[in-house]
């Protein structure tokens, strides 16, 4: 009975961690005027002190690409800071998720003007502004900003996140099928690493790892 209970708890925990599965048809690609759709960093990559919370989309090594609303919703937050995401826009969508666009060059004109006014009134270089549904509603495809290289960024790109609005749980845009990377090249094995394993305990034993090059004939 105890073993069954443990198995049940583990199973329900795993199922709960999966959460809602998003519908890729609810979203469009967040960038326009690209020569090709490529991304440079994946979800969950190890970063200093944290895991990467989204995907980084290439912008042809250029700034100023139009960033558009992935779905209907409204601009709920605008951030301007020296580090982190730099200039960032948060869109709360009607489908229950929030998308984040980071490292922007500039916001669209009306938002840019509002941010400038707030900076002068607050006498601050950075701002963190929140808005309700009636301030800046957006339709799918509306331009909200332009891509850039602001904040803690190593080159022009768009940082793209999807979160559950209520819980702030992160979704992997690639696993959810919202960002579809091109994968035209089969994997190629170039080396094999050999480590002896205890056949009873299933753990590596104290042996010197061996490495072998794979040669195609």
Walk through the language-model features, giving the residues of each.
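Aromatic/His-enriched, Gly/Pro-containing loop or helix-boundary segments
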Residues: 102-140
């Amino acid at each position: 009975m105890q073993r069954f209970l443990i198995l049940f708890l583990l199973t329900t925990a795993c199922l709960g961690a999966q959460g809602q599965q998003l519908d890729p048809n609810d979203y469009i690609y967040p960038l326009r005027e690209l020569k090709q759709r490529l991304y440079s960093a994946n979800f969950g990559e190890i970063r200093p002190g944290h895991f990467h919370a989204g995907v980084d989309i290439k912008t042809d090594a250029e700034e100023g690409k139009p960033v558009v609303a992935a779905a209907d919703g409204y601009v709920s937050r605008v951030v301007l800071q020296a580090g982190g995401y730099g200039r960032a826009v948060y869109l709360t969508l009607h489908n229950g998720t929030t998308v984040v666009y980071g490292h922007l060059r500039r916001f669209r004109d009306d938002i840019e003007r509002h941010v400038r006014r707030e900076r002068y009134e607050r006498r601050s270089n950075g701002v963190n502004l929140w808005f309700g549904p009636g301030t800046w509603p957006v339709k799918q495809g509306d331009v909200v900003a332009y891509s850039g290289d602001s904040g803690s960024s190593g080159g022009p790109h768009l940082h793209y996140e999807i979160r559950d609005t209520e819980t702030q749980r992160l979704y992997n845009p690639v696993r959810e099928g919202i960002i579809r990377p091109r994968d035209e090249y089969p994997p190629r094995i170039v080396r094999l690493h050999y480590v002896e394993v205890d056949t009873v305990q299933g753990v590596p034993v104290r042996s010197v790892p061996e490495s072998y090059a794979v040669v195609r004939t």
